[in-house]
Amino acid sequence: MDFNMKKLASDAGIFFTRAVQFTEEKFGQAEKTELDAHFESLLARADSTKNWTEKILRQTEVLLQPNPSARVEEFLYEKLDRKVPSRVTNGELLAQYMAEAASELGPTTPYGKTLIKVAEAEKHLGAAERDFIHTASINFLTPLRNFLEGDWKTISKERRLLQNRRLDLDASKARLKKAKAAEAKATTVPDFQETRPRNYILSASASALWNDEVDKAEQELRVAQTEFDRQAEVTRLLLEGISSTHVNHLRCLHEFIESQTTYYAQCYRHMLDLQKQLGRFPGTFVGTAEPASPPLSSTSPTTTAATMPMGPSVADLAPPGEAALRLEEVAPPASGTRKARVLYDYEAADSSELALLADELITVYSLPGMDPDWLIGERGNKKGKVPVTYLELLS
């Protein structure tokens, strides 16, 4: 108990000394040990890294989960070390509603059939979104969060300790300066009335007394300087580790972009497939009962847009008055053919398209007036339309 009281009194004295030194520095009444320029630049870079990492982390969380209530719920689950429950994505919820609507309104009607097809596509989009959120959380958010909750807390702790060591060092310098000034004054004009009781045997002169004070202050200064230098080196090593943090975050950023690219490619592929499937429904976009010759004024923009074909076909490229263009009669242009590598398997929807296998090489070219999302592909003596998104064009 006595030992604890002594330690408590010692800690209180150290805290008071640091508070006095800090206050005097703020008022310009005490000198302050300045860190070198390189150290200051390391501190500034570390602070900037921390601030921008926080902003990027928060905004990425908003991107992946726009609902603030859901983000708060996930945060609470993480703090309680509990597994975050699986959440239905908006696309999956929309798919569920569309499927239920098709079941109630009639799955055999044009509207019901279309609802079912769109529901399947929305379900695929929701699943792709779920995979993207999961991958981005692991490969990007988790490393950023680990830096803020791990490395940065260690750096902050060592910086606070360095600040305390600097205050101790400057307080020791101030104490030594005062002791030397008092010693010089006592040497010049000895005054035995200034001597005060000590825990050691008093010298017969005030000069000898202040000489002991100077020796003690110099010893304290050496200890404070050693501790400050040691702590400065520890903090410097941690701050220089920010470079490794940047390299790690760069790798994580590449992985995030890779997962985002995959996600959008999957979405685009699903929507292209949906567009082709809807284009095969002849009665999907036309009413069941139409006037034989509707008046021009009764045609609404909605009806006009609904009766438009979903996408161009090779037959659309035929000149007016001629039959549909036959692929076997299409000759490649004299220039403009390129080699392309197939990225994914592709099943031809009709005889005008060319089925593809992943990693095979084909020759591709474009014809005047073709949809920019499609090319003509040749493999041996076979040719047909191929989607651009399934290809990697080679130079």
From Swiss-Prot:
| Matching Pfam families | BAR (PF03114), SH3_9 (PF14604)
Q: Which UniProt keywords apply?
A: Acetylation, Coiled coil, Cytoplasm, Phosphoprotein, SH3 domain
GO biological process terms, alphabetically, are: membrane organization
Phosphoserine-modified residues are 10, 395
Which Gene3D superfamilies has this protein been placed in? Arfaptin homology (AH) domain/BAR domain (1.20.1270.60), SH3 Domains (2.30.30.40)
Instruction: Give the N-acetylmethionine positions (modified residues).
Output: 1
**Location of the BAR domain:** 24-287
As recorded in UniProt, coiled-coil segments are: 116-132, 206-240
Where is this gene product found? Answer: Cytoplasm
Return the CDD domains for the record: BAR_Endophilin_B2 (cd07617), SH3_Endophilin_B2 (cd11944)
According to the UniProt record, where is the region Membrane-binding amphipathic helix?
1-27
Per the record, its GO cellular-component terms are:
cytoplasm; membrane
**Entry's transmembrane regions:** none
Look up keyword Magnesium and say if it applies: no
Q: Check the record and name the PROSITE patterns matching this protein.
A: BAR (PS51021), SH3 (PS50002)
Q: Which residues form the SH3 domain?
A: 335-395
Question: What family is this?
Answer: Belongs to the endophilin family.
Subunit structure as annotated in this protein's UniProt entry: Homodimer, and heterodimer with SH3GLB1.
Question: Which protein are we looking at?
Answer: Endophilin-B2
Q: Which organism is it from?
A: Bos taurus (Bovine)
